[in-house]
Amino acid sequence: EGQPFMTTSCCPSYIQLVKKHIPEMEKYVSTTLSPMRYTAEIAKEKYPDCKTVFIGPCIAKRKEAEYSENVDFVMTFEELGSILDGMEINLEQVAPFQIDKEAYLSSHGYGSTGGVTKAVVEHLGGPEVNALLLSNLNKKNIGLLRAYAKSGKCPNQFIEVMACENGCISGPVTRIDKATAAKVYTKELAKMATQREQK
């Protein structure tokens, strides 16, 4: 509150970048935990003896899990895919899942560029946010973040930062290429929206 701008906090690679290389940015980073940590916290409250496993396209989640007593294991899509292949399980033949109709539909879009910003705007129910979307922690974008942190000034009030180009859907341990991932993701979000309308 009262800061000239704020950045997202859900990408663990970005958080490590700030801690190690741009400490001046730390005060501008949201204190909101990532969905992985909130979900694990809820699971442990509801089922105290359970073991929680985060499955995703991100290796950096392993580092983030070290900061949470609620996340027991982290598995990548590549690892899960290898297990499914080894057990000869074909996901195309598995019954489709039903989405939680109480959840914000936009929260399912977190994994792609602009998804976090959209979810924030929907949750607040206010006007559009003047956001900068940085979904590639290359030299240019790191330099930009460093400049904003050191000057304390940014033309945008909100910066959504994701280490991977196009967001988490292009994470380093997915099993499909970026273009296919984006198509599948968009298709699944549309399917979820249709399911919501039918409820």
Protein language model regions, located:
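Iron-sulfur-associated redox domains of electron-transfer enzymes in respiratory
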Residues: E1-K199
